[in-house]
């Protein structure tokens, strides 16, 4: 599995297509999100994605501090296959990129509530109550990177 970290402007058409195709499959068809996936933030994001001979297997986008959240954040996390470790692998790559690309001390996410335990295992802590975003319950979570 190859891990790639690129700003939107660096993506090839093939890479962008693979990312958007995977996101569409999950967010539009599986989860039936009530808001459009293409929200304009992809253009300022770094995209972290895992590929193999089958194409894009997992991806997320990372946004600079102050774009959507007070801290560096990531979202649009998708894995083609569940329970294969792909989600953990792409999140670990994002945590490393937060340090390397943004020199971040903290990462903030708006996690889908059903994935809370997944993120807690990865060192995230919750703040506040569950809220609705795009028709899906979410919770604000943070991870400190200082000791990594």
Predicted segment positions?
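Glycine-rich phosphate/pyrophosphate-binding loop shared by adenosine-nucleotide-utilizing enzymes
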Residues: 55-59, 72
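Conserved GNAT acetyl-CoA-binding A-motif
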Residues: 98-111
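Conserved acetyl-CoA binding element of GNAT-fold acetyltransferases
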Residues: 63, 69-81
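Short amphipathic alpha-helix that is part of the acyltransferase structural core
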Residues: 1-47, 51-56
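C-terminal "cap" of GNAT-fold acetyltransferases
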Residues: 112, 132-148
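Conserved acetyl-CoA-binding loop of GNAT-fold acetyltransferases
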Residues: 120-130
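Short acidic/glycine-enriched loop/turn segments that link adjacent beta-strands
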Residues: 43-44, 68, 133-137
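Conserved acetyl-CoA-binding loop-helix of GNAT-fold acetyltransferases
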Residues: 79, 84-96
